[in-house]
């Protein structure tokens, strides 16, 4: 992938949401920041938390919006503009209801599937044509509201698996950066 890349982990700010399904993007961004070897700092022009460095040998801007999920675009858009990153060089890491828990899928473009964070980013960029690292959380049981489900903490059984899933999603992000979409999909989708 061309440089620089903007890699964005989606989530909601604050301790109330820190361990919820909707914050998997933030969790992966934290792992990637550790791999870069830097701490997040507030980017004054966008308000997002940002780390700059190299992942998979590529120059990246790693970001976590500090606004609520459904407003993510208002910080991602200014970051993309500030760093002159076109949409096809943006990778958004997020939770995905339509994928089984723990599965990871990569794609470029497509719909938002009811994900308001993706909708906000697409609106701010003026296109849906950006890369996604989709981390499955599965559908809620019974008739539970999906919006409430993603804002709940993981079950005890899920919690035991989350650290491994987050590391795998970070690995998938680095593979996408290093190899491009199709080769990375061939590897990640076989996991």
UniProtKB/Swiss-Prot annotation:
Its main location: cytoplasm. InterPro entries: Pept_tRNA_hydro, Pept_tRNA_hydro_CS, Pept_tRNA_hydro_sf. GO terms for biological process: protein quality control for misfolded or incompletely synthesized proteins; rescue of stalled ribosome. The record marks 95 as: Stabilizes the basic form of H active site to accept a proton. The active site is at residue 22. Its EC number is 3.1.1.29. It comes from the Bacteria. SUPFAM superfamilies: Peptidyl-tRNA hydrolase-like. The keyword Transmembrane helix does not apply. GO terms for molecular function: peptidyl-tRNA hydrolase activity; tRNA binding. TRNA binds at residues 17, 68, 70, 116. It is found in: Cytoplasm. One of its GO terms (cellular component) is cytoplasm. It catalyses: an N-acyl-L-alpha-aminoacyl-tRNA + H2O = an N-acyl-L-amino acid + a tRNA + H(+). Keywords: Cytoplasm, Hydrolase, RNA-binding, tRNA-binding. Monomer. Belongs to the PTH family. Hydrolyzes ribosome-free peptidyl-tRNAs (with 1 or more amino acids incorporated), which drop off the ribosome during protein synthesis, or as a result of ribosome stalling. Catalyzes the release of premature peptidyl moieties from peptidyl-tRNA molecules trapped in stalled 50S ribosomal subunits, and thus maintains levels of free tRNAs and 50S ribosomes. This is Peptidyl-tRNA hydrolase. It comes from Mycolicibacterium smegmatis (strain ATCC 700084 / mc(2)155).
């Amino acid at each position: 992938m061309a440089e620089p890349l903007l890699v964005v982990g989606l989530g909601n700010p604050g301790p109330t949401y820190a361990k919820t399904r909707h914050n998997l993007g933030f969790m992966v961004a934290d792992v990637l920041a550790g791999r870069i070897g830097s701490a997040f700092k507030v980017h004054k022009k966008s308000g997002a938390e940002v780390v700059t460095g190299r992942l998979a040998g590529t120059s990246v801007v790693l970001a976590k919006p500090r606004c609520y999920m459904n407003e993510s675009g208002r910080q991602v858009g200014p970051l993309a503009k500030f760093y002159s990153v076109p949409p096809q060089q943006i990778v958004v890491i997020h939770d995905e209801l339509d994928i089984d828990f723990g599965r990871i899928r990569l794609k470029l473009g497509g719909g938002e599937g009811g994900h308001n964070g993706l909708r906000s980013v697409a609106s701010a960029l003026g296109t849906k044509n950006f890369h996604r690292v989709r981390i499955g959380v599965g559908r809620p049981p019974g008739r539970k509201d999906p919006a409430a489900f993603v804002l709940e903490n993981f079950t005890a059984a899920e919690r035991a698996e989350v650290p491994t899933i987050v590391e795998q999603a970070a690995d998938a992000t680095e593979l996408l950066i290093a190899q491009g979409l199709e080769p990375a999909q061939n590897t990640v989708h076989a996991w």
